[in-house]
Curated annotation (Swiss-Prot):
EC number: 3.5.1.108
Molecular functions (GO terms): metal ion binding; UDP-3-O-acyl-N-acetylglucosamine deacetylase activity
Active site, renumbered: 264 (proton donor)
UniProt GO BP: lipid A biosynthetic process
Protein's name according to its UniProt entry: UDP-3-O-acyl-N-acetylglucosamine deacetylase
Swiss-Prot/TrEMBL cofactor(s): Zn(2+)
Gene (UniProt): lpxC
Length: 280
């Protein structure tokens, strides 16, 4: 059985910023936690329940991933979760002073910086690295995801945006390690199409969105602070989101994930199927 030592942070770290959808300023605190705690969210502005970062606590997947427990809700967890998962952080208490995690620059960069600032501590207890007993898949309209047994965590993603000539079709495949995530995926920012901005605003979303935390694609070009960080930054960001969403399985696992046009809802659906076939 493949296993490794559990890991947590060496010290508490904080970051303050704005939430992209609700536009509220919030302070995020990451605290070390004991073995077998898992990743747990707490609303520091409420006396509500703790929210384990697990699939049964997924509350909403519209444009971001939201968790809940009782009356406590915490939104847009995926970029932080991707950073924690890719850094092999098993145990941490995440406190947030508002209902949404600060967005930073729209990527996982700020969360990787927080982890670096905190340092990583190896713990005594071990955690098994789970494997898939069989392939699983999820399909809905133009979205397809599959997970195959594999000796490493690999993600192959195809993004197809025929409605956006500036995005078009993009494909990337990575073996996910702390190094590959840090260099190839973590810097990649969230994005939106110019012609969907009004729709999102009408739904009460992206109230904190700006060019400091997102990239906007028009039919004839890109609106961004500076150049794209990669020519295929959108598909890399989709991989980032997928890592964050699948981390809610709650156990480290290895598999080859193949995705075509997936989003938060379908990512979570695949995560539930993966959970059913994990061993040990």
């Amino acid at each position: 059985m493949l296993e490794r030592a559990q890991r947590t942070l060496k010290r508490e770290v904080r970051y303050s910023g704005v939430g992209i959808h609700f536009g509220k300023s919030a302070t995020l605190t990451l605290e070390p936690a004991k073995e077998n705690t898992g990743i747990v969210f707490c609303r520091s502005d409420l006396l509500g329940e703790r929210i384990p970062a697990l699939l049964p606590h997924v509350y909403n997947t519209g444009r971001s991933t939201t968790l809940s427990a009782g009356d406590s809700v915490i939104a847009t967890v995926e970029h932080l979760m991707a950073a924690l998962r890719s850094s092999n952080i098993d145990n941490v208490i995440v406190r947030c002073s508002e209902e949404e995690i600060p967005i930073g620059d729209g990527s996982s960069h700020v969360f990787m910086q927080l982890i670096d600032d905190a340092g990583i501590c190896t713990q005594n207890d071990k955690v098994p690295i789970a494997r898939l007993s069989q392939p699983v898949y999820y399909q809905s309209q133009d979205t397809f995801l599959a997970a195959f047994p594999c000796d490493e965590l690999k993600i192959s993603y195809t993004l197809h945006y025929p409605q956006s000539p500036t995005i078009g079709t993009q494909y990337r495949s990575f073996v996910i390690t702390e190094e590959s995530f840090r260099k190839e995926i973590a810097p990649c920012r969230t994005f939106a199409l110019y012609n969907e901005l009004c729709f999102l605003m009408d739904r009460g979303l992206i109230r904190g969105g700006c060019l400091e935390n997102a990239v906007v694609f028009k039919d004839d070009g890109v609106i961004s602070l500076g150049q794209l960080r990669f020519s295929d930054e959108p598909v890399r960001h989709k991989i980032l989101d997928l890592i964050g969403d699948l981390s809610l399985v709650g156990r480290p696992f290895v598999a080859h994930i193949v995705a075509v046009g997936s989003g938060h809802s379908s990512n979570i659906a695949l995560g539930r199927k993966i959970l059913e076939v994990l061993q040990p």
